[in-house]
């Protein structure tokens, strides 16, 4: 993910987080069939998500850090939780979006980020 975002331009946290999410989804798209199988498995065996949760949490923290979003303290914890919720919502949309351009996923992500951006305490 860091490699794909090495030339990420400084802009608003919302725009940067959008770019980070889309870079992540582009990577996942390369392994779409396997990721979809993993999501299907985890939905049937949610207890196994606990085994990969530490790596998932680190990934969310990395996404926030790259986007210049605070990850320390109470506000940082709230930011991490919001990004996790966004991630689950977007993965659900991505899983159903069969278009090559991921247009539906991009639109949904932008709408969610816009709504969260309106909340002054987030990000």
Predicted regions and their residues:
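Residue-level recognition of alpha-helical structural elements
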Residues: 10-13, 17, 45-49, 72-79, ...
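Amphipathic alpha-helix face/heptad-repeat signature
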Residues: 17, 24, 52-55, 79, ...
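Solvent-exposed interaction surfaces and binding hotspots enriched for charged
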Residues: 11, 32, 49, 60, ...
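Amphipathic alpha-helical packing segments from all-alpha helical-bundle domains
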Residues: 46-69, 77-88
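Hydrophobic alpha-helical connector segments
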Residues: 3-37, 44
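Hydrophobic alpha-helical segments that form the core
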Residues: 75-95, 108-115
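Membrane-helix exit/interface motif
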Residues: 32-39, 63-68
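C-terminal peripheral helix-coil segments that are non-catalytic and often amphipathic
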Residues: 65, 96-123
């Amino acid at each position: 993910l860091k490699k794909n975002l090495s030339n990420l331009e400084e802009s608003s946290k919302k725009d940067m987080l959008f770019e980070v999410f889309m870079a992540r989804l582009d990577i996942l798209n390369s392994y779409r069939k396997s990721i979809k199988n993993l999501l299907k498995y985890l939905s049937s065996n949610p207890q196994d998500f606990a085994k990969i949760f530490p790596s998932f949490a680190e990934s969310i923290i990395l996404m926030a850090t790259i986007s210049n979003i605070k990850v320390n303290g109470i506000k940082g914890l709230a930011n991490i939780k919001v990004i996790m919720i966004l991630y689950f919502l977007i993965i659900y949309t991505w899983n159903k979006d069969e278009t090559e351009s991921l247009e539906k996923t991009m639109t949904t992500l932008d709408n969610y980020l816009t709504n969260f951006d309106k909340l002054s305490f987030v990000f």
